[in-house]
Amino acid sequence: MTRERPIRRVGIHEWGTHPVPPEHLRALLDDRDDLDCAFEVCSTDEAAEYDGVVTLFHHDEFLDGVEWVHNIRSGYEDFPLDDYRDGDVVMTNSTGVAGDLVAESVTGLVLTLAKGLHRFRDQQHEREWDRLSWERPFEVGQSSACVVGLGELGGSTASRLGVLGMDVDGVDIRPVSGLGLGRVYDPAQIENAVSDARFVVLTTPLNEATRGLVDGSVFEAMREDAYLINVSRGEIVVEGDLVEALENDEIAGAALDVFYDEPLPEDAPFWEMENVVVTPHAAAQADTYGDRIADLVATNVDRLTHGGTPWNRVV
């Protein structure tokens, strides 16, 4: 047990509409009959008036009297954790919410790249009826993948790809068993890990060890018919090296949900590349995202109020 932190008012910070509108999340929480807590959408300047704040991003105002901050993402690289500790502010994140959702998106991207579905969509807009060359589409169940990062996102992704019949290896700093994996490599062995994979899927969190992890040497180690899928963070890839690998046909293509700069600038080369699928950091989007966040927030309001340990405590 930890000390009780009565959470009676929670501000849902105004962050826009994605991945779930704040007003929708407030309505979901208001429908809970098991909580003695008021939920209100709040601005940054109003945050200090609340016992807890639910947010997408950190703001320094959260450190001025707030007992608890909940991050609706799993990633927290932009949160100053030492400041939270120094201020005795509990910080929790949303690990466990997005794993299945991202895995579904990765599955869709794998099938899109394998079958060339993005090409057909492009042709539809031009009213063109044209099949791909006979050898271009390939059978996913006879191919292989390497999932880099086997935490929440990677574990769910590896399991889903295994269901498709793929041979799946992984890369992680920890020894990981189960998940239908073949071999699990240490990050120092990433070039060996990706060398036989038709798909290299990036699901690792961003930190100092993973920033720039996937560079030109990794692309050189990949098969020429391999595809990169990135649903983690753009900074994990050395973007200039990826552009060069795509332009020089060192790899077959990519599906990219995350980038160095977001929104992706209009002059970014990826927009014009026929062998690249661009999605707007949307891999975790689903109509149930808000319900999952509401359940987690409600659980932590109850736990903090009664002296329990909150789920997904980071600080």
Q: Model features per residue range: what roles?
A:
Residues V89, T95-S144, T309-V314:
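Phosphate-binding beta-alpha-beta segment of Rossmann-like dinucleotide-binding domains, i.e.
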Residues V163-G180:
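NAD(P)-binding Rossmann-fold cofactor-contacting core
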Residues I7, G141-A145, G216, D225:
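Phosphate-coordination loops involved in phosphoryl transfer and adenosine-cofactor binding
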Residues T92-N93, V97-S105, R119, E262-V315:
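C-terminal helix-to-coil terminal segments
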Residues G154-G155, D215:
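N-terminal Rossmann-fold NAD(P) dinucleotide-binding loop
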